[in-house]
Amino acid sequence: MTNIRKSHPLMKIINNAFIDLPTPSNISSWWNFGSLLGLCLIMQILTGLFLAMHYTPDTTTAFSSITHICRDVNYGWTIRYLHANGASMFFICLYTHMGRGLYYGSYIFQETWNVGMMLLITVMATAFVGYVLPWGQMSFWAATVITNLLSAIPYIGTTLVEWVWGGFSVDKATLTRFFTLHFILPFITLTLTMVHLLFLHETGSNNPTGIPSNMDKIPFHPYHTIKDTMGALLLILSLLTLTLFAPDLLGDPDNYTPANPLNTPTHIKPEWYFLFAYAILRSVPNKLGGVLALLLSILILVFIPMLHTAKQRSMMFRPFSQFLFWTLIMDLLTLTWIGGQPVEHPYVTVGQLASILYFLLILILMPTASLIENKLLKW
């Protein structure tokens, strides 16, 4: 008799994806972040669902409904801060996952990489519309400033902004549609995740060496399930520590002031995970130029597979590329820091230099270093 795990139509899919899946034996802990992202998504959907039961998407009551959740709902504050800090954890895992993909050449699986890019954009959109919902000062002004960037589009810009706003300013219509989008986008993310896994399992996982590992594979369960469980426990521990000891560490104090269209905060800035892109946006003096630089800073990742000039897939044995990769990471950290600083000297200059270096590294320096390495290895 065939094992039900291998014969049942539904169980068979789960079995082939999480139990009997042939996995390279040498994948390191950097490969844990995919499963951690899945865990983050499930946690965000669950906490978000409970928050949506008590939240009211109306300009007059949105802020007070958040206060009500924190004060009157049983463990409402826990759910709220788990959701807010869960988003930070989500982006930490997301950026690490992408960094691993860049370092080890996982982008060679183009379909998986492209679906991953779609996931990145969807998650970023979800986080942005979600940031507007508490209807605090920073929520309101971040929504106003970022959506207003659409007005830089020639000819149709102003019409487009008013269409997104649902009026002549960020108001009730905007809040309602942002809540609707914030509710539906995680489920779109969930669907895209399944497509992402589908494409990944067509080729099998990459590994640190970048060399095909068909000769040396092990079943996913129990080896990698144990490894993933360890990662999951560490993630939950970090999230709980952050939520219970420093829930407002990554938030903005301005969001504890109800939204006021007549009073602009001194420094308008998004959440920390968007600061690198915000710094690139601000470093271009021209509005349209800034918007294009912002878009390109994210969309440039789509072209990474085309910019791969190395004969080797992974950076494991390529010291020049390794040096440039870590320079890129430092550059992104610098941009993140600059994005949170006021627009004044010397931050403006540092931001402009870091922005130039970001594009220079990806478009010119890294492909050139790969070609030099090919020559040195006589390939």
UniProtKB/Swiss-Prot annotation:
The answer to whether UniProt assigns keyword Mitochondrion to this entry is yes
Instruction: State where it is primarily located.
Output: mitochondrion
Cofactor(s) listed: heme b
Which keywords fit this entry according to its UniProt record? Electron transport, Heme, Iron, Membrane, Metal-binding, Mitochondrion, Mitochondrion inner membrane, Respiratory chain, Transmembrane, Transmembrane helix, Transport, Ubiquinone
Q: Function, please?
A: Component of the ubiquinol-cytochrome c reductase complex (complex III or cytochrome b-c1 complex) that is part of the mitochondrial respiratory chain. The b-c1 complex mediates electron transfer from ubiquinol to cytochrome c. Contributes to the generation of a proton gradient across the mitochondrial membrane that is then used for ATP synthesis.
Gene Ontology cellular component list: mitochondrial inner membrane; respiratory chain complex III
Q: Where are the transmembrane segments?
A: 33-53, 77-98, 113-133, 178-198, 226-246, 288-308, 320-340, 347-367
Pfam families named among the record's database cross-references: Cytochrom_B_C, Cytochrome_B
Q: What else is known?
A: Heme 1 (or BL or b562) is low-potential and absorbs at about 562 nm, and heme 2 (or BH or b566) is high-potential and absorbs at about 566 nm.
Instruction: State the family named in the UniProt similarity comment for this chain.
Output: Belongs to the cytochrome b family.
Q: Where does heme b b562 bind?
A: 83, 182
User: What are the binding positions for heme b b566 in this chain?
Assistant: 97, 196
Sites where the protein binds a ubiquinone: 201
From the Swiss-Prot or TrEMBL record, give the protein name.
Cytochrome b
